Amino acid sequence: MKEIVIASNNQGKINDFKVIFPDYHVIGISELIPDFDVEETGSTFEENAILKSEAAAKALNKTVIADDSGLEVFALNGEPGIYSARYAGENKSDEANIEKLLNKLGNTTDRRAQFVCVISMSGPDMETKVFKGTVSGEIADGKYGENGFGYDPIFYVPKLDKTMAQLSKEQKGQISHRRNAINLLQAFLEGDKNV
């Protein structure tokens, strides 16, 4: 079985990759380097993904995939953006992040939002490649559903009439921002150099 190393300690992200790559042995970097951590000093999802994949590839001397992803709310000028995981502060829960976002959005009628995922792939003998995927939706007025993680309970997908947290893992795996970025990665790996 082929192996994919993900430069992330976020179990939710690793589980997403496992669903999307069922024919691969997906390994989170903490299984190989328990204390691996890269300070995300970039100002964009792309910069942070590259920081992680290049640091992990150098440390392991093998090809590694990293992603940086988050939620952008149009009425909040793209917040929480690259701060999605720590929107309510360092080491705060998903619940705290959701509460802050809903409070900040208030009764705003423009609730358009998008999840963004930038995947970078780095290795010892290759130039880093970057792939970006998005999924559009709206911020719900409250939390709905029990599945997923992060902002999934408040991210409403109009064409499905459900939040991401109301979707099965398989359904989410087919439409997610991560899936869209991975589609580009897969096309590249299969030889489409126009990606």
Curated annotation (Swiss-Prot):
Binds 1 Mg(2+) ion per subunit. Mg(2+) binds at E39, D68. Keywords: Hydrolase, Magnesium, Metal-binding, Nucleotide metabolism, Nucleotide-binding. Substrate binds at S8, N9, N10, Q11, G12, K13, S69, F149, G150, Y151, D152, K172, H177, R178. The active site is at D68 (proton acceptor). One of its GO terms (molecular function) is XTP diphosphatase activity. Its cofactor is Mg(2+). One of its GO terms (biological process) is nucleotide metabolic process. It catalyses: XTP + H2O = XMP + diphosphate + H(+); dITP + H2O = dIMP + diphosphate + H(+); ITP + H2O = IMP + diphosphate + H(+). Its EC number is 3.6.1.66. GO terms for cellular component: cytosol. Belongs to the HAM1 NTPase family. Homodimer. HAMAP family: Non_canon_purine_NTPase. Pyrophosphatase that catalyzes the hydrolysis of nucleoside triphosphates to their monophosphate derivatives, with a high preference for the non-canonical purine nucleotides XTP (xanthosine triphosphate), dITP (deoxyinosine triphosphate) and ITP. Seems to function as a house-cleaning enzyme that removes non-canonical purine nucleotides from the nucleotide pool, thus preventing their incorporation into DNA/RNA and avoiding chromosomal lesions. This is dITP/XTP pyrophosphatase. The lineage of its organism: Bacteria, Bacillati, Bacillota, Bacilli, Bacillales.
